[in-house]
């Protein structure tokens, strides 16, 4: 327990909040232009070719964004919407692209969890 004298010398510090997605500037999503679309490999023990895009946001920040779902239509100069949310096995990837919005098409033939991939309801 600290003494009053110690608290007079150095007051208690309030814990500061550190954002997990600082490039969004406290916005829920942000628009950006793809500068490079490529695949990368995850950390051990996983193995795959994960689809990612380097995106220049409207606030001039460059971020790496994960493209979820099977298959995508993104290429350089595609305009995409970015949301927060990191990918645990890809270092440096702290954002997700929103499928079914702007130039990013929804996942074709998706039947379950459609809202996360921008897929329309199938005709029964």
UniProtKB/Swiss-Prot annotation:
InterPro entries: NA-bd_OB-fold (IPR012340), Ribosomal_uS12 (IPR006032), Ribosomal_uS12_bac (IPR005679). It comes from Xanthomonas oryzae pv. oryzae (strain KACC10331 / KXO85). SUPFAM superfamilies: Nucleic acid-binding proteins. GO terms for biological process: translation. One of its GO terms (cellular component) is small ribosomal subunit. It comes from the Bacteria. NCBIfam families: rpsL_bact. The keyword Cell membrane does not apply. One of its GO terms (molecular function) is structural constituent of ribosome. Keywords: Methylation, Ribonucleoprotein, Ribosomal protein, RNA-binding, rRNA-binding, tRNA-binding. This is Small ribosomal subunit protein uS12. With S4 and S5 plays an important role in translational accuracy. Interacts with and stabilizes bases of the 16S rRNA that are involved in tRNA selection in the A site and with the mRNA backbone. Located at the interface of the 30S and 50S subunits, it traverses the body of the 30S subunit contacting proteins on the other side and probably holding the rRNA structure together. The combined cluster of proteins S8, S12 and S17 appears to hold together the shoulder and platform of the 30S subunit. Part of the 30S ribosomal subunit. Contacts proteins S8 and S17. May interact with IF1 in the 30S initiation complex. Belongs to the universal ribosomal protein uS12 family. Residues 1-24 are annotated as: Disordered. The modification 3-methylthioaspartic acid is found at residue 89. Transmembrane segments: none annotated.
């Amino acid at each position: 327990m600290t003494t009053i004298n110690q608290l007079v010398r150095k007051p208690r510090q309030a814990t500061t909040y550190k954002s997990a997605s600082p490039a969004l500037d406290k916005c829920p999503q942000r628009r950006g232009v793809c500068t490079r679309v490529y695949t990368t490999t995850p950390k051990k023990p996983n193995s795959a070719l994960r689809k990612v895009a380097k995106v220049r946001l409207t606030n001039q920040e460059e971020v790496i964004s994960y493209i979820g779902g099977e298959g995508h239509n993104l290429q350089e100069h595609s305009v995409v919407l970015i949301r927060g949310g990191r990918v645990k096995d890809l270092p440096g990837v702290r954002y997700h692209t929103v499928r079914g919005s702007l130039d990013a098409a929804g996942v074709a033939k998706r039947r379950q969890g459609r809202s996360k991939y921008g897929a329309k309801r199938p005709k029964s």
